[in-house]
Amino acid sequence: MRVLMLGWEFPPHISGGLGTACLGITQGLTEKGVDLTFILPSMKEEEAGQSETKLRSASGVPISHALKKAVERVRHQQNYDEFSELLMRPVNARLHPYGYDYSQSVDANAFNSDDIAEISHFHGGYKDDLMDEVYRFSTAAAAVVLEENAKKKADVIHAHDWMTYPAATIASRLSGLPFVAHLHATEFDRCGDHGWDVIYGIERDGLHAADHVIAVSERTKRIAVERYGVPEHKVSVVYNGAFLNEDIPTFEIPEAIKNEKRVLFMARITFQKGPEYFVEAARLVLNEMPNTRFIMAGSGDLLPRMMKRVAELRMGSQFHFPGFMRGKEEVYRMYSMADLFVMPSVSEPFGIAPLEALQCGAPILISKQSGCAEVLPAALTVDYWDVRRMADRIMDCLNYPVMAQESLRQCQADLQLLTWGRAAEGILAAYSHVCPNA
């Protein structure tokens, strides 16, 4: 089976769980014998040779006039004409859902014609010009898909999250290949009911354009069905996995903090991850257990507000902000030094971080609003908004380490079932809905 996969990030350049999940998925599928090419906006030339996955960059790909016109026709049919206007200013309007069964073949030589209309370059990532990059990537990625499909016939296009849905939709319409959308997170997860209608529209259009949808949890499937109107039969649930064979180094805890209890939050410091609830729970814990150290590792738009709140509560000596952790060793060091890892997410589609914490031997306390709670029944859970209960749970774990260790032991046993190989089997089953003969 041959898969052309579209993604926005891939190790070593990641900003969160999406890149990690893409790595696990590609490794799992490759081990199952899948011929897979991963297409992303940009990468360094040397990275293509270092990765076990076949990587293709859409940066610098020539776009012929013929292909550009074909893409524009698809955009018109898919109501993407208004997308270009959204690049100039934020607007409060939904994109229309797809309402056409449209397919058009393109000459296999259209992508490499000498008559070049444009060449796009991308930096990737999530900068201020993200919408512009998403728009241009939809053309460049389509060119790469057509080229790869001409080299060797593919069976399916698999696209990760909203940034790649327009590209996958256009590539699918031009190539005739089925499109599977992988839903790792939604605008409702990221922003609650106050998200950007433009992104919601792109997500909704992409999920309706897809021939099949993969959701990372039952929670995410419910959102796809109830908030995006995706037919329930069109959505398969495939849980993420963990890198179980990875060697976890051991770390010495510095003498200066050996006698303290350490509670860790490590995530993007944004609305979705619930950092404010962690800060308020820390206040309640420190009132009763002042010999506790809280760590909030990560970066994000709420970081300044969290630092200000910690200062207002006069917790600076016991609450630390080490910043974004770069590299696996730094991440593993933080987990390994923690007596408890807390994930108080407001809405977490799955949550790979708790799996990593468990691998490093850290007990976990996760919100009931997280997808990974579905597959970790022994995990300690709390409603993200119940700060008093969260503080009590934290103190229970710190005061009764036997209880925390028993939860850890049971969670680590459940973790053995969460392999990327098992995830790959679920993805292959999802593919069978759209390409049964592959």
Each predicted region: which residue ranges?
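Short hydrophobic beta-strand element within catalytic cores of glycosyltransferases
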Residues: 363-366
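Carbohydrate-associated surface elements
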Residues: 219, 241
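Short alpha-helical donor nucleotide-sugar binding micro-motif in glycosyltransferases
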Residues: 324, 332-338
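Nucleotide-activated donor-binding/catalytic signature segment of Leloir-type glycosyltransferases, i.e.
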Residues: 305-325
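A conserved catalytic-core segment of Leloir-type glycosyltransferases
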Residues: 37-151
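Aromatic "clamp/platform" in nucleotide-sugar-dependent glycosyltransferases that forms part
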Residues: 346
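Conserved donor-binding/catalytic core segment of Leloir-type glycosyltransferases
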Residues: 256-282
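Conserved acidic donor-binding segment of nucleotide-sugar-dependent glycosyltransferases
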Residues: 379-388, 396-401
